[in-house]
Amino acid sequence: MPSTPADAKGLLKSAIRDDDPVIFIEQERMYGNKGEVPDDTDFTVPLGVADVKREGTDATIVARSLMVPVALKAAEVLEKEGVSCEVIDPRTIRPLDIDTIVESVKQTNRVVVAEESHPFCGVGAEISAEIMTRAFDYLDAPVRRVSGADVPMPYAKNLEERAIPGVEQLVAAVREIAYMD
């Protein structure tokens, strides 16, 4: 699930070239996003390799697709409060680069998993479960999930924006696991 135009190009090319079946999921709200895209016709992004979008020391935010820019904005807000957040974009969910996520959690000891989808049976739930299984002894706070509202996704833009988590929710979640509130 790409979060940047470059990732969209690179992941799609990798999906096409892969010998196994691949489901490529795009976030429609990101179609108008602009950004750097390599001119290299052979540019690919390897499947199953996460991207550390921002390094940090106090908390890890795992976010995919539409939530990556939100997580980066939340990290900027929190930096002004003295909290350094690492932002990880898994980019693919199967294979999932859980090792990069776990290594970050081992360093920061706190994690928020952010996703726009429903809280029940979401990818964020699986990522949270994997973190609990592989990095429980490193956690100084419970894994905190921030997900979309548990409602059918509305088509009206104003309602859709209310159903998807924003910067404020992510900032509040990090403050909670950092015991700032």
What kind of feature is each model-predicted range?
Residues 20-21, 58:
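Short, surface-exposed beta-edge/turn micro-motifs
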Residues 19-20, 109:
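Residue-level detector of structured alpha->beta connecting loops
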Residues 28-181:
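Thiamine diphosphate
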Residues 1-18:
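Conserved thiamine diphosphate
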